[in-house]
């Protein structure tokens, strides 16, 4: 089992997204995504997302809000559980991310991006302020 986090940072009607184009053999290459990654030993979901967002963007988020849990059975040969957060409070300046190009995308344009098919489902739920608990098969 793999535990991971995902965060969508909000500012002025926009969401910070990363266009994955930097890593070799990245399963997410060419897709837009939120920020996040795998847990380190002993971390809580909140500690993990705060660390991952900082490493990938240079932003220090405060008070991330848990808005869902996604389950990906047998993804890359393993069961993944992904804690999904949003955040609106942060400090810092964007860095040149090791994951890809960071960009503030207007919320009304997000569903037009090249996202994973499943992202369309939970992005709509998040925009409506709903809590999401869903199994997704890729």
Spans of model-derived segments:
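Conserved N-terminal beta-strand and adjoining loop/helix that marks the start
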Residues: 1-17, 38
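Short, charged/polar surface micro-motifs in flexible loops or helix N-caps
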Residues: 10-14, 23, 88-93, 129-130
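Conserved Nudix-box catalytic region and its N-terminal flanking loop in Nudix hydrolases
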Residues: 15-51, 55, 138
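Short glycine/proline-enriched turns and hinge-like loops at secondary-structure junctions
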Residues: 27-29, 77-79, 96-98
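Active-site segment of metal-dependent pyrophosphate-handling enzymes
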Residues: 58-92
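NUDIX/MutT-family hydrolases
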Residues: 84-86, 95-126
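Charged phosphate-binding loop/patch that engages nucleotide di/tri-phosphates or the phosphate backbone
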Residues: 125-138
């Amino acid at each position: 089992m793999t535990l991971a986090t995902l965060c969508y940072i909000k500012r002025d009607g926009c969401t910070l997204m990363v266009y994955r184009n930097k890593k070799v053999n990245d399963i997410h290459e060419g897709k837009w995504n939120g920020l996040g990654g795998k847990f380190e030993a002993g971390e809580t979901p909140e500690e993990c997302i705060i660390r991952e967002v900082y490493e990938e963007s240079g932003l220090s988020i405060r008070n991330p809000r848990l808005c869902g849990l996604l389950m990906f059975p047998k993804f890359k040969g393993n069961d993944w559980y992904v804690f999904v957060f949003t955040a609106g409070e942060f400090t810092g300046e964007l860095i040149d991310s090791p994951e890809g190009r960071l960009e503030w995308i207007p919320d009304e344009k997000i569903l037009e991006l090249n996202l994973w098919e499943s992202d369309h489902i939970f992005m709509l739920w998040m925009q409506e302020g709903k809590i999401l608990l869903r199994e997704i098969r890729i």
